[in-house]
Amino acid sequence: MFQKFISKHNAPINSTQLAATKTPAVAAPVLSVPNLSRSTILINATTTAVTTHSGLCHVVRIDETNPTNHHALSIAGSLSNVPADMIAFAIRFEVADGVVPTAVPALYDVYPIETFNNGKAISFKDAVTIDSHPRTVGNDVYAGIMLWSNAWTASTISGVLSVNQVNREATVLQPLK
């Protein structure tokens, strides 16, 4: 029996800075234009007040060239001035080929991750295994982080969000004898 183990989050060398006003929604808006395989954004976003279940997300387009269908998605983030009930989770969804998503579609996969929220700040670092090939032929696959809350206040959220598709860096562990 062999296991694949991802030992650390390898953040991209370059990053994008985002300073914008965003309105959380049930169809969570995408924070920035998705890159291929990996992306880190420095976020300084002003959120508008919303009193319903809603969210924001940061995603990347998944590289489908690898013949294996299962890849690790490493995600990490640290944000301040967030709602006390905010949670973060990994998501995966598909859109038609060539379409750049501006919001998460109605159908998406959710993967739980380890999240720490102290009421004013949230941090997380985890890895999940996702299907990297589209389930519907001709679609593009996107995956990333969704930030979700029952109610958002008008505030400025600051921090870092990072998503990395790990498709080449895996260490194979053998069981002890």
UniProtKB/Swiss-Prot annotation:
The keyword Oxidoreductase appears for this protein: no
A cellular component annotation (GO) from this entry: viral capsid
Keywords: Capsid protein, Host-virus interaction, Viral attachment to host cell, Viral genome ejection through host cell envelope, Viral penetration into host cytoplasm, Virion, Virus entry into host cell
UniProt xrefs under InterPro entries: Capsid/spike_ssDNA_virus, Spike_G, Viral_coat
Domain of life where this protein originates: Viruses
Cell compartment(s), UniProt: Virion
GO biological-process terms attached to the record: symbiont entry into host cell; symbiont-mediated perturbation of host process; virion attachment to host cell
Subunit structure: The virion is composed of 60 copies each of the F, G, and J proteins, and 12 copies of the H protein. There are 12 spikes which are each composed of 5 G and one H proteins.
Family designation: Belongs to the microvirus G protein family.
General function of this protein: Attaches the circulating virion to the bacterial lipopolysaccharides which serve as receptor for the virus. Determines the phage host-range. Probably triggers with protein H the injection of the phage DNA into the host cytoplasm upon conformational changes induced by the interaction with host lipopolysaccharides.
The protein, known as: Major spike protein G
Gene: G
